[in-house]
Amino acid sequence: MLGLPTETEDDMKGIAHLAQKIAETYYEVVPKEQRRGKVQINVSTSFFVPKPFTPFQWAPMFREEDFIEKAKVVKNEIRSQLNQRSIRYNWHEPDVTVLEGFLARGDRRCSKVILKAY
């Protein structure tokens, strides 16, 4: 998950480092003759949406552009890794995340907006 209020750039890069460590462990543990080709690791992140009645309910939500920048930090860190071809990275669409935040924090007045948009 990206976009937590306490998140640092090291936290974001840590996602890529964990994927790299998993790939390295595979090559260390599985004997070469037992491997079925190269390892393929799928890394997927979603973006934090503050929800009511949780410790982060009053935390601000990032803008769409900020979410994309955070995803690019992870993507660029994966590209700099030794096993970059073994790791695929995708992320949740930021516009859907913003909509989710609107629905999660909105009240009954949101229904008019939803009806008009639909």
Label the model's feature ranges.
Residues 1-118:
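A structural motif corresponding to the C-terminal lobe/cap of the Radical SAM core domain
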